[in-house]
Amino acid sequence: MSGKTIWDPLRRKDVPLTPEERVRQWFIGVMHSDMHVPMHMMMSEVGFKFGDGPVQKDFRADIVVYDRKPAPAMIVECKRPDVELDGQVMEQALRYNAVLDVRHIAVTNGLKTFFVTKGEDGVFRAADKIPDYEEIISQETRK
């Protein structure tokens, strides 16, 4: 590590500048400027436990977007640009969703970004467009 840092506006501190962190900070900017997600409705590096009893494991979601309750509404999984966004990456986000129970998931490596939305039947499908914040927090489900 070179010792370089980047400002994380969500954690309000400098963090080590890694390739994944660069993608995370870029996507925070995209969500704020293009998707109109208020900064105070996002958190980065959100820790949670998954599993029952003594087999619980600690996990961290890269970014979680919250609705106005505040309850989780979207998970974002960020990868380095050289990581292919394959089924394993989406499976990781879906595992996180087993705990956080969101309607929207995004995965990005800074070069490609995929969004999926949960339909009325509970199945996640590719989103036909990038949702803005009001769509993300909407309680209405779509097929």
Please provide the spans of the model-predicted regions.
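A short, conserved, highly charged catalytic patch centered on acidic carboxylates
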Residues: 1-104, 111-143
